[in-house]
Amino acid sequence: MPYMRVSLSVKLAEEQKQSLYEKLGEALRHIPGKEPFMLMADIEDGRQFYAYGKKQENFAFVDARYFSRVEYHAKKDFAVAAMKAIEEVAGTKSTNISMNIFELSTWAGFGDLNDEFYKDPGDGDGAGR
């Protein structure tokens, strides 16, 4: 279920978007139990950002979400790797990238609901994805 929305002020070619998706998937490996093939990514390019009192020319914002909570060092490694991927593909310096990380305890998908803190006795194994 890992989801990332990457909003970029720069425009990317389709090949660059694919490369960014692949590199973000590799960054996701820092989150225990997550693999690149699990990543859902929405890559928006050509966006206009205003921050620090002015329009930003090369800026990015990342909204990352995944199921469960992980230790600080894993989150930090993930964030640094994601920002490095953006810098490599889009040329946006990590100092011009802002990122939110949401750790979700409830997630629905593939026709089911998963909750980190609740197991319905009638749900089979109740395992989250």
For each feature predicted by the language model, list its residue ranges.
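Interaction-mediating elements
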Residues: 1-129
